[in-house]
Amino acid sequence: MARLGVNIDHVATLRQARGGTEPDPVAAAAIAEFAGADGITIHLREDRRHIQDRDLKILRQTVQTRLNLEMAATDEMVAIALSVKPEACTLVPEKRAELTTEGGLDVRIHQEALKLAIEKLQAGGIIVSLFIDPDPDQIKVANKIGADYIEIHTGSFAEAKSWKEEELELIKIENAVKLARKLDLGVNAGHGLNYNNVKKVAAIGGIEEFNIGHSIMSRAILVGLDRAVRDMSELVRYA
């Protein structure tokens, strides 16, 4: 049975739009956990456009499930992670001009820097995942440099323009899961998943956790966060 990690970045985005104190991502995390979330995911970006250092520090004290910190593999972020000690860190690519994370890490090009970050984080007792496209070469290098997990970038599947294209992307994801499992890598997935498409990916099997944010927060505006999390949790667990 797969787990659901709820990404609360968009709660912080709404707060930062006015530069005030509400809505508070810390409160949203508590509601999500009460509703059945298995973990809370946040992305502390270098430009601090949504989640702030204050959020991370308080969430480390209040999250009762598990805290997953998405971050760039920079010296600053590694130092922050080692001081806060989330259960897991997911290393992601980061561009200041992007609206959200676009595509997976190119582990082949950046393997030396990623390997160093992985080693430092693991030495601090933190589980490390790499956010990558469902590409066999990327998975093999992720394993080579010592990652504990991969998180499969499901954006191409979510943005497929036709049934045929969607099926091809599902096959890529399924093959990626099989390869990762063969290499003893844990597997998570996320990006672009919503209430209409997540069951197709969850039905593949072998994916331990789905990290979902935008779709849950969009639904929460209409039905409330508790209901939105419960509905997504049911889809993920019983696909």
From Swiss-Prot:
Q: Which HAMAP family does this UniProt record tie to the protein?
A: PdxJ
Locate the site labelled Transition state stabilizer: E151
Any GO BP: pyridoxine biosynthetic process
Per the entry, what this protein does is: Catalyzes the complicated ring closure reaction between the two acyclic compounds 1-deoxy-D-xylulose-5-phosphate (DXP) and 3-amino-2-oxopropyl phosphate (1-amino-acetone-3-phosphate or AAP) to form pyridoxine 5'-phosphate (PNP) and inorganic phosphate.
Q: Where does 1-deoxy-D-xylulose 5-phosphate bind?
A: D9, H10, R45, H50, T100
MF (Gene Ontology): pyridoxine 5'-phosphate synthase activity
Pfam families documented for this protein: PdxJ
- Cellular component annotations (GO), alphabetically ordered: cytosol
State the name under which the record lists this protein: Pyridoxine 5'-phosphate synthase
Q: Which residues cross the membrane?
A: none
From the UniProt record, report the name of the gene that encodes this protein: pdxJ
Task: List the EC numbers from the record.
Answer: 2.6.99.2
**Top-level enzyme category:** transferase
The entry's keywords: Cytoplasm, Pyridoxine biosynthesis, Transferase
Q: Which reaction does it catalyse?
A: 3-amino-2-oxopropyl phosphate + 1-deoxy-D-xylulose 5-phosphate = pyridoxine 5'-phosphate + phosphate + 2 H2O + H(+)
Q: Mind telling me which CDD domains this protein's record contains?
A: PNPsynthase
